[in-house]
């Protein structure tokens, strides 16, 4: 679930607001976006992936909020970690994202299930 936006890193570009499928964020009047509807967060990480400033921290727990501070997530190196390990933007060459390979895995699993159901 989205936990925080580090205001001194945020560039107020609005990309996180635009990509959020559940409309969790609202534009701030003078600063970073506001976490307006946190309970609607699906923990899809889209906001974190699209944040080039690495200002957003989404905790992997989708059922409850986790109490963290900006200082903690910075010290632990959590900011930008999901983007990096997903091979997003500048990390493409160093950490290639091979999740597209799952398409083949799912297709083969579906074919195997169909064959299994055809047998008497």
Segments from the language model and where they lie:
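Aromatic-flanked redox-active Cys/Sec active sites in thiol-based oxidoreductases
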Residues: 7, 22, 38
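Flanking helices and flexible, charged tails adjoining ferredoxin-like Fe-S electron-transfer domains
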Residues: 46-120
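Iron-sulfur cluster-binding cysteine motifs and their immediate structural context
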Residues: 4, 15-32, 46-64
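Amphipathic, hydrophobic secondary-structure cores in small proteins
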Residues: 34-35, 41
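N-terminal pre-triad scaffold of radical SAM enzymes
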Residues: 3-9
């Amino acid at each position: 679930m989205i936990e925080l936006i580090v205001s001194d890193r945020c560039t107020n570009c609005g990309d996180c607001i635009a990509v959020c499928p559940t409309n969790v964020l609202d534009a701030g009047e003078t600063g970073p976006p506001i976490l307006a509807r946190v309970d609607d967060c699906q923990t899809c990480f889209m906001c974190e992936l699209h944040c080039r400033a690495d200002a957003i921290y989404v905790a992997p727990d989708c059922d409850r909020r986790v109490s963290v501070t900006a200082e903690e997530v910075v010290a632990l190196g959590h900011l930008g970690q999901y983007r990096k390990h997903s091979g997003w933007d500048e990390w493409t060459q160093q950490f290639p994202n091979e999740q597209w390979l799952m398409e083949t895995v799912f297709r083969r699993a579906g074919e195997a299930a169909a064959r299994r159901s055809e047998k008497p």
